[in-house]
Regions:
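Low-complexity, glycine- and small/polar-enriched segments
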Residues: 1-221
């Protein structure tokens, strides 16, 4: 922007939040076969990002920032924060009950995300305190159960959990590309004057949690 900002406080916040109960994303698939010769297979896939086509997938981008070449004068706090927090739980179950049965269960969940917070531009900053923080805390769970109850039994399963994340907090630089997480402008020299005891906090934190659970069972005659 090109206008001078004079305010008591400033908050810039961008977030993806989990619901108070349950998962943000979930998917389930169940297959069963009870014929004399039974074959059943189930597959569940979930992609969390900007494109559902994995071959052409792009990051989910959550971004909070200020880009100003003019002065920013705030009596109190300047808080700029970006947070990604979601859960994804998918389940694939295949059960086969024929005398000669084969079943496979495939469960795959992937996430690509960027959490970015920045204070850019060349304008001076005067504030009581300054906080620029980016964080991410996704949790992915993939579950697969495959079973067969025939005399000649075969069953297989696959679980895949994958997170590709970038978390960045910057002062003096701004992001320049939605497709390249490493593409940021050259840093500007900024004059920052902080008058309060809270000072300046610049933080980037990421906690990626993944779990895969698989069970295969078969029974004889």
């Amino acid at each position: 922007g090109h206008g001078t900002l004079d305010a008591g406080a400033m908050l810039v916040d961008a977030k993806v939040s989990s619901p108070t109960s349950g998962d943000t994303f979930n998917a389930d698939a169940t297959g069963s076969a009870g014929a004399l010769i039974g074959v059943t297979a189930t597959q569940t896939e979930l992609f969390v990002g900007n494109e559902s086509t994995v071959s052409n997938s792009r990051d989910m981008i959550v971004r909070a920032g200020v880009d100003s070449n003019q002065s920013i004068d705030v009596d109190g706090a300047i808080d700029i924060g970006s947070n990604v927090n979601f859960t994804a739980d998918i389940d694939s179950s295949a059960y086969a009950g024929g005398l000669v049965a084969a079943g496979a269960a495939i469960s795959r969940v992937r996430a690509q995300l960027r959490s970015e917070a920045y204070l850019g531009g060349s304008g001076s900053v005067n504030a009581g305190s300054l906080s620029v923080g980016a964080s991410s805390d996704p949790k992915l769970v993939a579950r697969a159960t495959a079973g067969s109850g025939g005399v000649f039994a075969g069953a297989g399963l696959e679980t895949l959990t994958e997170i590709n994340s970038s978390v960045r907090a910057m002062v003096g630089s701004v992001p320049t590309s939605d497709s390249d997480a490493s593409s940021w402008s050259s840093a500007n020299n900024k004059s920052i004057n902080i008058t309060g005891i809270e000072g300046v906090t610049i933080s980037a934190n990421s906690s990626n949690r993944v779990n895969g659970y698989g069970e295969v069972f078969s029974g004889g005659a």
